[in-house]
């Protein structure tokens, strides 16, 4: 066999496995995201079995939840000539740094949890950082931000809102979309500001917000900062009646224990997956790991893995003796052509810049019970 692929090929000998790298956050305060996604990957590989007679070799790299982690993980993946594809990252900040490296190496990367609109925006003038080879089964936060803005205005009856982000591409983009939608509907934004990752003292920003008390505070930030904001706002004069709303960055089964009873009443926008396929996944999770997944993107991760493995199998050339030749551009072309993929999270069709999901698998939850996980679903009703 001869490689004619414009980006080159990965050769897999008959006695070698097909190698895939999973780049997720495996350490630190939000490692539950990585646990959630890697569980979905492992179950998908269990279900898939061999790929054209080859075992699947899954390599884990800790992309953390920052640019440095994403860059390091991507460099390791790109340096390994055996790698056929990449699954990840968890966080948009890690993906922003990883993407140029992965793209330059000719690899394809499918994320199950990146949601920042910038990652699939091709125009740098609009903040876009998209590079060829990037795909995601997670929603674009243009959908989640709209959901948050509409829910605040229509269901909560809010007419004023404030937002807090942490400077990350994810949080900054999401709060801005929410603010734009809320304003379009007729609402007024009283404050937009940021905390730093690592901050523990939130009273200064909360006191500033209280100078013009909003009906709702939207703060799509991660633990532990989201815990500190939720807890410390309770003692701020003027914010006693402000409704609190966070997002999928805070959607974790340990958020109640990490925050305390001040968490009660908090709204969360986050993925909402339903159906028989999803129930089967949960049963497999319980059998393999015990209990329930710790966050919300395990279904998306399962879908991303199945998409990648099916794509690899569809483009691989087999010499009849089990030796494979897998074209890198062929993988990209096949992923970009995906339409109507029947996944656990819905029907997926990939855009020219890698957005494969719609906003169908999104909902709003409210934490009303310190012992219940997942929280009560309030939208859709």
Predicted regions and their residues:
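Extracytosolic ligand-binding ectodomains
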Residues: 1-381
